[in-house]
């Protein structure tokens, strides 16, 4: 049996991080977590590009352009959508999820979903570096593994 896995060494690899400015008090923590993991796994500072977009809805469009340009080995999408009193949360969460998934399926580079969709600010804070870890860190680890897996396929 041949088992293929992605290694967790990212030396010489380039990563793009697309991050939403909306709920920036959370997304700043997600991006810090992602950058920390990338650097711990040998990604040079100059090989990390950060693209700020206004909100989560804009993430897929920018991620698609980056994935198509061929400059980066992986794209990490980070954002935070917190449920409010209107259905807006449902629409945004669904569309950003579908958009990132669609790009990931059509792209030759891994596109990783690291967008929080939470029912409360407390849940978002927990997932941005407190009780529930840092989902930005998790997304970066997934990106490293998937970049290496894509190379092995």
From Swiss-Prot:
InterPro entries: LS, LS/RS, LS/RS_sf. GO terms for biological process: riboflavin biosynthetic process. GO terms for cellular component: cytosol; riboflavin synthase complex. Gene3D superfamilies: Lumazine/riboflavin synthase. It comes from the Bacteria. (2S)-2-hydroxy-3-oxobutyl phosphate binds at residues 85-86, 127. It is an enzyme of class 2 (transferase). The active site is at residue 88. Disulfide bonds: none annotated. Its EC number is 2.5.1.78. 5-amino-6-(D-ribitylamino)uracil binds at residues 22, 56-58, 80-82, 113. It catalyses: (2S)-2-hydroxy-3-oxobutyl phosphate + 5-amino-6-(D-ribitylamino)uracil = 6,7-dimethyl-8-(1-D-ribityl)lumazine + phosphate + 2 H2O + H(+). GO terms for molecular function: 6,7-dimethyl-8-ribityllumazine synthase activity. Keywords: Riboflavin biosynthesis, Transferase. Catalyzes the formation of 6,7-dimethyl-8-ribityllumazine by condensation of 5-amino-6-(D-ribitylamino)uracil with 3,4-dihydroxy-2-butanone 4-phosphate. This is the penultimate step in the biosynthesis of riboflavin. Belongs to the DMRL synthase family. This is 6,7-dimethyl-8-ribityllumazine synthase. It comes from Endomicrobium trichonymphae. The gene is ribH.
